[in-house]
Amino acid sequence: METLLKVLSGTLLWQLTWVRSQQPVQSPQAVILREGEDAVINCSSSKALYSVHWYRQKHGEAPVFLMILLKGGEQKGHDKISASFNEKKQQSSLYLTASQLSYSGTYFCGTE
């Protein structure tokens, strides 16, 4: 039997983001995967980005910090979850490779 994973993306708004009017936009809003499939979640802003924070929240639990990407930094990752930061496009992408059931949850980006 195939196991389906439901991965939701949402927007985590930081106080600093509100002050600077940099509400990030994530796409796609929802992804449904089978185990072993890959997915990409994008986080972009119309304003200059200096850092992007990625989090995952499982149902009924607090968000868990995944990683931070800084302006001028390289791609980061651990296990089969990685992210990149494209300064020119003002966008960060979170890559879920060979998805597992443990990847289920809501993914958030925060920006400054």
Swiss-Prot record:
InterPro entries: Ig-like_dom (IPR007110), Ig-like_dom_sf (IPR036179), Ig-like_fold (IPR013783), Ig_V-set (IPR013106), TCR_alpha_variable (IPR051896). Residues 1-21 form the signal peptide. GO terms for biological process: adaptive immune response; response to bacterium. Pfam families: V-set. One of its GO terms (cellular component) is T cell receptor complex. Residues 24-112 form the Ig-like domain. V region of the variable domain of T cell receptor (TR) alpha chain that participates in the antigen recognition. Alpha-beta T cell receptors are antigen specific receptors which are essential to the immune response and are present on the cell surface of T lymphocytes. Recognize peptide-major histocompatibility (MH) (pMH) complexes that are displayed by antigen presenting cells (APC), a prerequisite for efficient T cell adaptive immunity against pathogens. This is T cell receptor alpha variable 30. It comes from Homo sapiens (Human). The gene is TRAV30.
